[in-house]
């Protein structure tokens, strides 16, 4: 039997990463329109987001999924599944920008996937589920 875990912000909350519900207004700043029209403020938001996640460690849930070797489909961009040792992770909303990408992060695609952008990994997630 194949097991797939679907995870989102809740799994990383115990690691000290707030959910979007804990950060009112953040969704409005994670749109392609905002990134294009307000690139400096968008860069600031992304830097703050990256700084918040920097130094965070996987919690027991991340570690147990890694230990069990469970395939993971996650909406998170924090990389904690990979940091816990999971090797089969599909991050459907992409990743955070690397430090050297922050000065031009408004032009990146899938780092992370922004609201209004096509999420290119959704079909991969559907394929995994349909293959169960």
Language-model-detected regions and their locations in the chain:
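Conserved catalytic core of sirtuin-type NAD+-dependent deacylases
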Residues: 1-132
